[in-house]
């Protein structure tokens, strides 16, 4: 019975410590995805007037 309480405490402590290191990796991944999204948005912003003009002609 005592071992299970200690085991649960150790598992919770490890999860708390590991969650801090995971946040850095996830933050970096999120920034990369955000940058890619911005590039796609800017490219679409440039291409949409051209596409609208071609569609109006055709």
Swiss-Prot record:
Result for mutant: residue 16 to V: In strain: GAM5A and GAM5B
GO CC annotation, single: extracellular space
Tissue spec. comment: Relatively abundant in head, thorax and to a lesser extent in abdominal carcass and anterior midgut.
Stored InterPro entries: Cecropin (IPR000875), Cecropin_insect (IPR020400)
Keywords, in A-Z order: Amidation, Antibiotic, Antimicrobial, Fungicide, Immunity, Innate immunity, Secreted, Signal
GO biological process: antibacterial humoral response; defense response to fungus; defense response to Gram-negative bacterium; defense response to Gram-positive bacterium; innate immune response; killing of cells of another organism
Residues in the signal sequence: 1-23
UniProt effect for mutating residue 34 to D: In strain: GAM12B
Biological source species: Anopheles gambiae
Gene: CecA
Subcellular location, principal: secreted
Function of the molecule: Antibacterial activity against several Gram-positive and Gram-negative bacteria. Antifungal activity against A.fumigatus, B.cinerea, F.culmorum, F.oxysporum, N.crassa, C.albicans, C.neoformans and S.cerevisiae.
Sites bearing Leucine amide, chain numbering: 57
Membership in a protein family: Belongs to the cecropin family.
Protein name as it appears in the record: Cecropin-A
Location of this chain's protein in the cell: Secreted
Induction section of the entry: By bacterial infection.
Keyword Cell membrane appears in the UniProt entry: no
Pfam families in UniProt: Cecropin
């Amino acid at each position: 019975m005592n071992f299970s309480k200690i085991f649960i405490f150790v598992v919770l402590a490890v999860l708390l410590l590991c969650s801090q290191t995971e946040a850095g990796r996830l933050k970096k991944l999120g920034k990369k995805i955000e940058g890619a999204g911005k590039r796609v948005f800017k490219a679409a912003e440039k291409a949409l007037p051209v596409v609208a003009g071609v569609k109006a002609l055709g």
